[in-house]
A protein has these predicted regions:
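A shared catalytic/ligand-binding motif for oxyanion handling
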Residues: 1-141
Length: 141
């Protein structure tokens, strides 16, 4: 289970957030309030955190899930602050594109979850982001 805009920081200790049977994984916003991403992974799942797909200026957590008798699966939990937010870096889109290119080049099924602050119902909203996702073979579900 992934949570975007977790609003966690170093004042929130993991022991108070722990759920029995799950491992808490966090990527808190480094500067300012709000934002952040956290994921609860079941203890019985075989997975590995992919720090190589996480960038300091993007709020995300990437995991590789190892499934018996199947290819591994990449899952990215991403939070993109809204346009105009002081927390949305100027190079978010290019950094995000680099991460997606790296992830999809691994020939693994890839799931991207989270909040990209992109309204798919408006055809004019974030055309470049939509083109990028389509180019990478990712579909909005």
């Amino acid at each position: 289970m992934g949570i975007t805009e977790s609003h966690l920081n170093n004042s929130h200790v993991d022991t108070r957030l722990q759920i029995d049977g799950y491992k808490l994984i966090r990527n808190d916003r480094r500067k300012g309030k709000g934002g952040g991403v956290c994921v609860y992974m079941r203890d019985d799942m075989n997975w590995q955190r992919r720090h190589d797909l996480e960038r300091e200026d993007n709020e995300s957590i990437w995991l590789e899930l190892f499934i018996k008798k199947s290819k591994s699966l990449l899952v990215g939990f991403v939070y993109r602050p809204p346009d105009g937010s002081k927390h949305l870096g100027n190079d978010f889109d290019s950094t995000f594109a680099d991460v997606l290119l790296t992830a999809t080049a691994e020939d693994k099924e890839t799931i991207l979850a989270g909040d990209l602050n992109c309204n798919y119902m408006k055809s004019s909203d974030h055309k470049d982001l939509k083109k990028l996702l389509k180019y990478m073979g990712l579909n909005n579900l």
